[in-house]
Regions:
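Bilayer-spanning, highly hydrophobic alpha-helical transmembrane segments
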Residues: 288-304
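Membrane-helix interface motif
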Residues: 302-316
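Membrane-embedded alpha-helical signal segments
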Residues: 1-293, 315, 319-322
Length: 325
């Protein structure tokens, strides 16, 4: 926990200016304003701000009268600010974390707290079908690099209050946002506790490779079991189906993929089209792929070994040998 804000407005502003290093960081903007005769300032990240929303809020703030200001910042956020996504922060670390995530922070003289206005708009690409995970049937949308859009794509498919999306962070410096998606009444509680414990125990400075870095921290590499411990998908319908089956889907900010935990060999060989076939047909196709993969893995090296050592070939398999003309 960092230091808490005080009632001294100038002290709060000076501390934030020093920590944010405004003289060097050109993209962190501080704008001084006056609200109902009081000194105030807003901090925001250039490129993350939805300007149309901020213009409306500033227009409202400029029209406020002194008698309309409540005694506390919490009352200001609850009853005065005409915006839905408003929060109150009293801890300096919380303010810095939210500000560097794109939240606009408002400091107002006479309050010992900061008002957070979530007016952010991330640079992003449009929702489109994944290039490496296409399906002949079904939806044509896919995950993007913006975390809240990915959670919305899952919420759109599972409209149940039992669907939980638990927010976590990892990385001391990067403070990467992570969301665990699962059904309250179907998830394996023991697995969920273990997964949350391992994420909380991560001591890395940053998750530079998103889910790949997270996966390496969660699972230790063991030569005894070489099979994958998780599955990646870029399709919201496949992720939603996995959640309804009792699995946990891990979403990481800045990544267009979802990590499904736990998984099995049969999950690795399935394709998105399998969900749109009857259960018997889908199971048959998955079993066929698994058998083909197993045969390819075992039969090819066995044939090469017997070809190089013909004396090992039994008589009933002599027909596989290549005979000279």
């Amino acid at each position: 926990m960092g230091e808490k804000l005080s009632m001294d407005y100038n002290e709060n502003v000076s501390r934030l200016n020093e920590v944010l290093n405004l003289d060097t960081n050109f993209d962190i903007i501080r704008k001084g304003i006056t609200i109902a005769g009081r000194e105030a300032c807003i901090y925001f990240i250039d490129g993350f701000l939805e300007e149309a929303i901020m213009e409306k809020l500033l227009e409202f703030f400029y029209k406020l009268k002194p008698e309309e200001l409540p005694k506390t910042a919490q009352q200001m956020a609850d009853h005065v600010v005409p915006y839905v996504e408003v929060s109150v922060m009293i801890d300096e670390d919380d303010i810095l974390k939210n500000l560097l995530s794109g939240v606009t922070c408002l400091l107002l003289s006479g309050y010992d707290a900061c008002i957070g206005l979530d007016c952010r708009s991330y640079p992003m690409r449009s929702v489109s079908e994944p290039s490496k995970d296409k399906a002949l049937r079904g939806s044509k949308d896919g995950f993007v690099e913006t975390l809240v859009f990915n959670t919305a794509l899952i919420r759109r498919r599972i409209r149940s209050p039992k669907l939980s999306m638990e927010h976590m962070t990892a990385g001391r410096t990067s403070q990467t946002d992570i969301v665990l998606c699962y059904m309250e009444n179907r998830v394996d509680r023991r697995l969920l506790r273990e997964l949350k414990g391992r994420i909380n125990a991560i001591k890395l400075d940053s998750l530079t490779m998103n889910q790949e870095s997270l996966a390496e921290c969660i699972y230790e590499r063991k030569w005894i079991n070489p099979f994958p411990k998780f599955k990646f998908t870029e399709r919201p319908d496949a992720a939603s189906a996995a959640i309804l089956e009792g699995n946990i889907v891990v979403l990481v900010d800045n990544s267009p993929q979802a990590m499904i935990i736990p998984t099995s060999v049969f999950d690795i060989v399935e394709e998105a089209d399998d969900y749109y076939f009857p259960p018997v047909t889908g199971s048959y196709l998955r079993l066929t792929r698994f058998l083909i993969a197993l045969i390819t893995l075992l039969l090819t090296p066995t044939f090469l070994l017997l070809f190089q050592n013909p004396e090992w070939v039994p008589e009933w398999l002599a027909f596989i040998q290549i005979k000279e003309a």
